[in-house]
Amino acid sequence: MMMMKTTIMRNFVLPSIEDVAGKAGFLNYTQLKKMAEENRRSFHLKCTGTNQNVNGLSGGNKQKVNLGRWLAKDLSILIVDCPTRGVDVGVKAYIYDCLREAKKKGIGTIMITDELVEAIGMADNIVVMKNGEVKKTIGRSSGFNEEEIIEVMV
């Protein structure tokens, strides 16, 4: 979970803190700042700097921080919950690109979404759940049929 009342830098480095702590557990501020700056540039954040509080960012930039803090780690799986909710079309496309790039790197992604078009466009498999139960799993290879998916959802 992203911390809204703290800086971009702290949000970026918190999930990776054990990766940058020295042998005695001390943190190297210079290394933390460098890591945050690299992430700021890599994720094209529009901000005054990594010392800016996250709550002062636009919705799209908040989402970039939230996604970027995890993609900066060496992950095997990423779970995202409505990653494009409330962002403009440009940021939405950028987030999709980030998720596709993660897939190319071998990071398995579970995307929770309530947008059917998003699920069809991004997924290799769609799992339709209703009332906490899996109703159907549909693979891209068998073809995503929007009407069929809606029928299972209703």
Features from the language model and the residues they span:
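Glycine-rich phosphate-binding loops of nucleotide-dependent enzymes
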Residues: 1-154
